[in-house]
From Swiss-Prot:
GO molecular function: DNA binding
InterPro entries given in the database record: Integrase-like_N, TACO1_YebC-like_2nd/3rd_dom, TACO1_YebC_N, Transcrip_reg_TACO1-like, Transcrip_reg_TACO1-like_dom3, YebC-like
Record-level GO BP terms: regulation of DNA-templated transcription
Protein name: Probable transcriptional regulatory protein Dred_1658
One term under GO cellular component: cytosol
Keywords assigned by UniProt, alphabetized: Cytoplasm, DNA-binding, Transcription, Transcription regulation
HAMAP family the record matches: Transcrip_reg_TACO1
Family: Belongs to the TACO1 family.
SUPFAM superfamilies listed in its UniProt record: YebC-like (SSF75625)
Compartments reported by the entry: Cytoplasm
Pfam families, per the entry: TACO1_YebC_N, Transcrip_reg
Lineage: Bacteria, Bacillati, Bacillota, Clostridia, Eubacteriales
Amino acid sequence: MSGHSKWSTIKRKKAKIDSQRGKVFTKLSKEIIIAARNGGADPNGNMRLKAAIEKAKIANIPNDNIQRAIQKGAGGGDGANFEEFSYEGYGPGGIAILLNVATDNRNRTAGEVRHILSKHGGNLGETGCVNWMFDEKGIIIIDRSEVNMSEDDIMLAALEAGAEDVKVEDDSFEISTAPEDLQSVKTALIDQGIPVADADTTMVPQTTVKLQGEDAEKMNKMIELLEDNDDIQEVFTNYEEE
């Protein structure tokens, strides 16, 4: 998550989907498999699976693919043996990097991550070295172009639903919640006729750091390569883009 608005980041990622649809399908299918493996095949009783299915539908993954991924995860067959863990490290200028990984080959992934970081002025760190710089939050995005309510009404509805804060951006409202309250706040907003453009848990940096010149170029390239890696599900940093 960069210093730009979360909605801007989401739209930037969605713009890449058409050119990298195969990678997007792979990552979202993997998330569905893991969610079904850990919590069962019924999305009504498995919030992680429900969220993964919603992401897959937004990315236009065919329903047949979604169902196959659910069956693969719930059945525990081949392809369901992904290991989940996090890597922590640093980018140029001491930027904090937190990576959520799901892989069937830890050694391969470690080598690839280490190579990407070291080639662009960063390095892997020990467990816990940067995690403390982030807070886990639920983030709900409301696209301003999709609602006719005033800022005050949106903020009041969100806070009454249990949100912690509402950030007003040029093109969106970014509503933050405790992770465990994400689904209930989202449901309450939808029930009031407020369309939700995106909702997910994320790691929010407590403070952000700006880079300039060569360091900024290296950091941008590093993030691009990390996000493109099939084994890396999520990339979080405290880097604030100019």
